[in-house]
Amino acid sequence: MYNTILISSEACTGKTTFAKKNKKVLDLDFFESKILKGLSEKKQQEQIYRFVKIIKKLQKSGVYEYILITTDSRFVKEYINQDLEMAIVLPHIEDIHTYVDRARKRGNTLKWIKEYFEVGLKEISIIEEMIKGTNIKLFKISKDEFLEDLIPNIDKIFKKSWFFD
């Protein structure tokens, strides 16, 4: 167990706001689109592997209290392959309209919203299935909550045994 908690959380759950309010939070969620852009599938896999290795080193370093990372299923697969211990925050599918509204309010284009949620809805179910039996703990976020609201519950699970380590 590490002092740094990795949190993978869906779009529109309040990651950026949480990171801006806390100096000990590193938000790396936006990097995945930048590191994969224009690469072949093989090169993407290599980049994902390297990126997750870096995340693992950052987690072990203890420099940050929380590191926020993507829920892209390609990355989740690599989190599992590299045996990361972490939290993943996903919305209830029936609440998805709330996240569409949040995306509009924060200024995302209709094209972005449509593309994201067409993929996102499919990925939620895929990710839930992928993480069963792994070191990844699932937290469901309700339509009235933001990531910040789940932090006490995440801390209870990931920080509970630090006193005994």
Give the label of every model feature segment:
Residues 3-7, 63-69, 86:
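Generic beta-sheet signal
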Residues 3-22:
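Glycine-rich phosphate-binding P-loop
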Residues 8-10, 69-73, 91-92, 141-144:
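Structural motif
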Residues 23-82:
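Conserved nucleotide-sensing/catalytic segment adjacent to the nucleotide-binding pocket
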Residues 25-27, 86-88, 135-140:
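Conserved beta-strand scaffold positions in the cores of enzyme catalytic domains, especially
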Residues 35-39, 95-104, 149-151:
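Short, charged, surface-exposed secondary-structure boundary motifs
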Residues 68-71, 82-102:
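Conserved phosphate-donor/acceptor-positioning beta-strand/loop module used by diverse small-molecule
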Residues 108-165:
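Small-molecule kinase domains that catalyze NTP-dependent phosphoryl transfer to phosphate-bearing small molecules
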